[in-house]
Curated annotation (Swiss-Prot):
Protein's gene: Sdccag8
One Pfam family here: CCCAP
Cell location: Cytoplasm, Cytoskeleton, Microtubule organizing center, Centrosome, Centriole; Cytoplasm, Cytoskeleton, Microtubule organizing center, Centrosome; Cytoplasm, Cytoskeleton, Cilium basal body; Cell junction
UniProt name for this protein: Serologically defined colon cancer antigen 8 homolog
Keyword Cytoplasm: yes
Oligomeric form and interacting partners: Homodimer. Interacts with OFD1; the interaction is direct. Interacts with FAM161A. Interacts with RABEP2, ERC1 and CEP131.
Length: 717
């Protein structure tokens, strides 16, 4: 994780400042320790051997001078102490040396306890500095951990947003490919099954649908229903045309058969009239010879007639067998035609059902697509508005932070001015004090008060650290709960996506099955057309055979008359059968129309149910989106709270740094105060030396005067 430049500069400056403080504290402690050790050594050597103290002290001063060049006040103190000890050793008489240890002990009692008391104070200050540095490090570590966690949360949010953005175009591409494939299949089906007029009517709405994707779903549904109705009308018109053509052919055949029957009837009447005329032209009475001759002729003529009758009966039998075969072939052809008609009818029904289900699936897909587009647009708008709100809130927070910083800086300036005034007052009070002992006692009291303040500050800092730890634990708990909730939500979304994918796969399988059924129906239609072609050929052959039979019937009157009567009966039966078939077809068509109407009503009801289901699904999706938006707002609020807490912790860290700086300034002031006290001590020691010199002079004058006093009475005497 990359740190910001401002944080890096602050950390570098704090580290440098801590190093400089450590070095200065170590130097001052080392100097004071060396000074105290040297003073102790000089006191012990004076007690043991005053004659050798001068040389040892000169050597020690030579070594200490190189070690303590930087502290001028300490060197001056050392020099004054050594001068005082040397003068006392040189000038004090032997009888005064017995009493002298008491006085220096008093001086030492007045001066040395302050130095001994300074050592624990300095040690406590160094410990306090180390404690503050450890606390600052702990605060820095906590801040860095919080920053890392916040950055991890931000990165996770960005990753999730990128995944959502990448999933949306993939889903839209899949839907577009599915719709394009379904549209192409529908166009190809319409091109193969319908006329050019229906093709144009089908192409126009698709082209308009491709060009005008932004229109509502109602207009597209109306156009599709119109196309379906036109297609059904065309199919029924084609069926009616076929039936009418068949009826016309049958009527023509009936007219031809009626004409042949009338011709045969006229011929029979003519022959009967001829037979009656021949019978009437015969003579009544004849002779025996003539009667015998006529009888012979009649027998011969009867034999001829019998032969012709037998021949005609044979031909009639042959023709009847041929007619039976022709009738059987016609019956088979009719059966084939009926089976083909039923197959075509079944295929048409299957295609109609397949087309209807296909249109229904396409309508559902388009409705889902429109709903998804609306949802995506609404979500994008909500995201844009939320981003704008976040930007505005960030700007407001930045302005408030800048204002708070300015207020804090102004407060710090006022506090620094007050501190400067108080320090000036303290310096005035300390200057007014004359006695070094009282001044040192005040210093001790001041140090004790500082220690109390330090302990209070430490307690406050520990309390604040405990607070920060508690807040950190709460933040971690909230973060864990948020992670668990986010994982649950993601799992629910993944399950919903898998359900939708399964539904899409099922719809695709259903469409493929319907396409396979349509292909099978096409194959069956081709087979039926082939069978119809064969039936037409057979009908043509039968017609040729009928023509040949009619030519043979024209030569034979009686047989044709009988056959004509039989044919009339058969034709009447056929006409009755055709009428019954026509009635049946009309009833079947009426039933088909009624069934189709009922089917359409059922489809309308199913469409209404599907629309209600889609509305329910849309309401559910909207409620889920609202819930997700609420959760998003809740998470945004949490993030803002965490950012505010982070800012507060940063401000606390800055305040700790400022407190640290104030403590450093206090330490500097204490150093300055110690230097001032050392200078005052130097001045006091100088005054003490002057007083000792004056005392010595006075003692010498008193001794001289005492020496002069005994001589004065002798001279008087």
């Amino acid at each position: 994780m990359a740190k910001s430049p401002g944080n890096s500069t602050l950390e570098d400056s704090l580290g440098q400042y801590q190093r400089s403080l450590r070095e200065r504290a170590n130097r001052s402690i080392h100097q004071l320790k060396c000074a105290l050790r040297e003073v102790d050594v000089t006191v012990e050597e004076d007690a043991l051997d005053p004659s050798t103290s001068i040389n040892v002290e000169n050597e020690d001063t030579g070594v200490a001078w190189h070690e303590l060049q930087h502290s001028h006040a300490v060197n001056q103190l050392k020099a004054l102490l050594r001068q005082q000890t040397n003068k006392e050793n040189e000038t004090s008489p032997p009888r005064r040396r017995k009493l002298s240890p008491s006085r220096p002990s008093e001086c030492d009692d007045g001066s040395m306890p302050t130095m001994h008391n300074l050592v624990p104070i300095i040690n406590d200050q160094s410990q306090y500095i180390h404690h503050l540095e450890a606390e600052v490090k702990f605060c820095k570590d906590e801040l860095s951990g919080m920053k890392n966690r916040v950055q991890v949360v931000v990165l996770e949010n960005e990753r999730l947003q990128q995944e959502l953005k990448s999933q949306r175009p993939e889903e839209t591409l899949r839907e577009q490919t599915f719709l394009d494939a379904s549209g192409n299949m529908q166009n190809s089906w319409i091109m193969t099954r319908e006329d050019s007029r229906v093709d144009e009517a089908a192409k126009r709405p698709f082209s308009h649908g491709d060009a005008e994707t932004g229109k509502t779903a109602s207009t597209g549904d109306a156009n599709k229903w119109k196309l379906e109705l036109e297609r059904l009308k065309l199919t029924y018109e084609a069926k009616t045309d076929l039936l009418e053509s068949q009826l016309m052919l049958l009527r023509k055949d009936l007219a031809e058969y009626q004409k042949t029957c009338e011709d045969l009837k006229e011929r029979l009447k003519h022959k009967e009239s001829l037979l009656a005329a021949s019978a009437s032209s015969r003579v009544g009475g004849l002779c025996l010879k003539c009667a015998q001759h006529e009888a012979v002729l009649s027998q011969t003529h009867s034999n001829v007639h019998i032969q012709t009758i037998e021949r005609l009966t044979k031909e009639r039998d042959d023709l009847m067998s041929v007619l039976v075969s022709v009738r059987s072939s016609l019956a088979e052809a009719q059966k084939r035609e009926t089976s083909a008609y039923e197959q075509v009818k079944h295929a048409v029904q299957m295609t109609e059902e397949a087309n209807f289900e296909k249109t229904k699936a396409l309508i559902q897909c388009e409705q889902l697509k429109s709903e998804l587009e609306r949802q995506t647009e609404r979500l994008e708008k909500e995201l844009a508005s939320q981003q704008e709100k976040r930007a505005v809130e960030k700007e407001m927070i930045k302005k408030e932070v800048a204002r708070e910083r300015e207020d804090a800086e102004s407060k710090m300036l006022i506090l620094s001015q007050n501190i400067a005034k108080l320090e000036a007052q303290v310096e005035k009070v300390t200057r007014e004090k004359t006695a070094a002992v009282s001044h040192l006692e005040e210093i001790q009291n001041h140090v004790a008060s500082q220690e109390m303040d330090v302990t209070k500050v430490c307690g406050e800092m520990r309390f604040q650290l405990n607070k920060t730890k508690m807040e950190k634990d709460e933040v971690e708990k909230e973060h864990r709960e948020y992670k668990a909730k986010s994982h649950k939500d993601l799992e629910m979304k993944v399950q919903e996506i898998e359900k939708l994918r399964l539904e899409l796969s099922e719809s695709e399988q259903h469409v493929e099955q319907e396409q396979q059924k349509a292909a099978r129906a096409r194959q069956e239609c081709l087979r039926v057309t082939e069978l119809l072609g064969e039936a037409e050929r057979q009908l043509h052959l039968t017609r040729l055979e009928k023509d040949s039979i009619q030519q043979s019937f024209s030569n034979e009157a009686k047989a044709q008359a009988l056959q004509a009567q039989q044919r009339e009966q058969e034709l009447t039966q056929k006409i009755q059968q055709m009428e019954t078939q026509h009635d049946k077809t009309e009833s079947e068509q009426y039933l088909l129309l009624t069934s189709q109407n009922t089917f359409l009503t059922k489809l309308k009801e199913e469409c209404c149910l599907l629309a209600k289901k889609l509305e329910k699904v849309s309401l559910k999706s909207r409620s889920q989106i609202v819930r997700l938006s609420q959760e998003k707002r809740y998470l945004c609020d949490k993030l803002e709270k965490l950012q505010k807490r982070n800012d507060e912790l940063e401000e606390q860290c800055i305040q700790h740094g400022r407190v640290h700086e104030t403590m450093k300034e206090r330490l500097r002031q204490l150093d300055k105060h110690g230097q001032a006290t050392a200078q005052q001590l130097v001045q006091l020691l100088n005054k003490q030396n002057q007083l000792l010199l004056e005392r010595q002079n006075l003692s010498e004058e008193v001794a001289r005067l005492r020496a002069q006093l005994p001589s004065m009475p002798q001279s008087d005497c």
